[in-house]
Amino acid sequence: MTSFRERLVSARDQKHSKDHPYFELWAKGKLTKEQTALYCIQHYHYVAEYLNWMAYEASQVPHRDVKTYLFENLGDEENPEDRHLDMLTDYVVACDLKREDVEGSAILAATEALQNWGWRLVYQRPWQIALAAMFIGLESQFLDICKKLVPALHKHYGYAPGAREIRFFEEHIHADEVHGSKGFAIVEKYCRMAELQEQAVRAVEEAAVRRWRYMNGIYWYALHGKEDDTP
C-alpha cells in the first residue's frame, strides 16, 4: 500500500521543475549568464511573496511546533547577516546586471500568477493544506533543482566550489534538506484524516503545476524575450 508521504512525493514529481527544459539547458551550460540571472530575478519576486505567505500562516496556525518551524524558516531566509534575497541579488550582479535593477524589474505574468495563487492558497484553504502545497509542492523542489545546477555552475560557468557568488545555490542544498524533512513531518503529523490527506495530495500536485507554468514564463522571457504568452 502506498504511504501518504509516497503519494505526496509522487504528486510533486509529476511536474517537478527540475525537469523543466530551462533547467535542462542550464545544467548543460547552454544558457548565458544573463539568461540564468533572469531566472534569479523572477525567483526573487516569487520568494519575497513566499516569505509573506509563511508569516501569514504563522499568525493563523494554532500549534506551537508549526509556528516554531515557520519562524525558524523565516529567520534563516531573513538572516540580517546574509539574507537569502541578498544572496540571489549577488548572483545577478555577478552576471553583469545591476543590483538596483532586481527589485525594480518587471514581474512576468507567470510569476505574478504564482504570487496571486499563493495568496489565494493561504487565505482560502485550511492551513494544513496550504502548508502541504508550500512545503512540499513548492519549497521541497528547490533541493533537487540546486543539486542539478551547482555542478553546472562549477563546470560550465567558472565558479569555484564555495564561491560567494553562488552561495545561494550551494547553501540551499544543506538548508533545504533540513527544511524539506521538517516540512514533510509537519504535513504527515497534521493531515491524519483521509479527507485532509486527499486535499493535501491534490494541493501538492496543483502547486507543482503552478511552479512549472511559472518556469514556462521564465523560459520564454530568457530565451525569446517574450514577457507573456501572446502568440
Regions found by a protein language model. Give the residues of each.
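Non-heme di-metal
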Residues: 1-231
